[in-house]
């Protein structure tokens, strides 16, 4: 069900990050070197989740693994216990909550018209539903942290905090972000570009679907323009 996926990605997944933030308050802050294995595991987990996204053929699975990879960055940022890391983690949790929820909503819009979630079978929608293609483009740009979105601000904070703590982490972070851009582009091209493979009649988009996307994009844009609200 689409509602379950949206709530799971936007809220329940972030409860784990909130729990780690609360737990870190009772752990020693002066000796963060002892947390190095956990940080490496979090970043390596993010890379593996991103690589898993690249080989997905199911649209919902791809978006779900995308959420997992972003939470790896959040965990790494929280564990180093610096103000920048914590601010970046909180900002990324909020920004990615909106982004992944919007992507699940768009995936459901596609599924209702094609009755399949296989990427290769959902192509060609830019000719049929051009407005939906615009929403797909915006959601994917937010997913790859394009400026001036909140995702960009949060990933920049996380990258700065981790690089300041250990410069070697920039290799894993850079690799993770490169793969994120690759699968986001792959997802957009697979679902929107090319010629439609299904000959069934497609119903037009409803106002409620556009309203749902606007209610995802506008809060994220407002927070992007005034990040003091959460950072």
Swiss-Prot record:
Keyword terms, alphabetized: Electron transport, Membrane, Mitochondrion, NAD, Respiratory chain, Translocase, Transmembrane, Transmembrane helix, Transport, Ubiquinone
Matching InterPro entries: NADH_UbQ_OxRdtase (IPR003918), ND/Mrp_TM (IPR001750)
Compartments, as annotated in UniProt: Mitochondrion membrane
Membrane topology: Multi-pass membrane protein
Top EC group: translocase
One Gene Ontology molecular-function label: ubiquinone binding
Catalytic activity, EC: 7.1.1.2
Cellular component, GO annotation: mitochondrial membrane
Catalytic activity as recorded in UniProt: a ubiquinone + NADH + 5 H(+)(in) = a ubiquinol + NAD(+) + 4 H(+)(out)
Membrane-spanning ranges: 1-21, 34-54, 63-85, 89-111, 128-148, 156-176
Example of a GO biological process term: ATP synthesis coupled electron transport
Disulfide bonds: none
Function: Core subunit of the mitochondrial membrane respiratory chain NADH dehydrogenase (Complex I) that is believed to belong to the minimal assembly required for catalysis. Complex I functions in the transfer of electrons from NADH to the respiratory chain. The immediate electron acceptor for the enzyme is believed to be ubiquinone.
The family this protein is said to belong to: Belongs to the complex I subunit 4 family.
Cross-referenced PANTHER family: NADH-UBIQUINONE OXIDOREDUCTASE CHAIN 4
Protein name in the entry: NADH-ubiquinone oxidoreductase chain 4
Natural source organism: Trimeresurus stejnegeri
Lineage, opening ranks: Eukaryota, Metazoa, Chordata, Craniata, Vertebrata
Gene responsible for this protein: MT-ND4
């Amino acid at each position: 069900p689409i509602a379950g996926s949206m709530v799971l990605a936007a809220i329940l997944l972030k409860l784990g990050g909130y729990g780690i933030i609360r737990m870190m308050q009772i752990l020693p802050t002066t000796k963060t070197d002892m947390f190095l294995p956990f940080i490496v595991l979090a970043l390596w987990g993010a890379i593996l989740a991103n690589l898993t996204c690249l080989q997905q053929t199911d649209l919902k699975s791809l978006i779900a693994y995308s959420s997992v990879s972003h939470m790896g960055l959040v965990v790494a940022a929280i564990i180093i216990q610096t103000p920048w890391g914590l601010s970046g983690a909180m900002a990324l949790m909020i920004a990615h909550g909106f982004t992944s929820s919007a992507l699940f909503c768009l995936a459901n819009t596609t599924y209702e018209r094609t009755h399949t979630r296989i990427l290769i079978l959902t192509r060609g929608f830019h000719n049929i539903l051009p407005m939906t293609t615009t929403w797909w483009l915006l959601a994917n740009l937010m997913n790859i942290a394009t400026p001036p979105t909140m995702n960009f601000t949060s990933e920049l904070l996380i990258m700065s905090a981790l690089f300041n703590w250990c410069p070697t982490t920039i290799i894993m972070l850079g690799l993770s972000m490169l793969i994120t851009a690759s699968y986001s582009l792959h997802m957009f091209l697979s679902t929107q570009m090319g010629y439609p493979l299904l000959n069934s009649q497609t119903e037009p988009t409803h106002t409620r679907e556009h309203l749902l996307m606007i209610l995802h994009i506008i809060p994220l844009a407002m927070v992007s323009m005034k990040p003091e609200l959460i950072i």
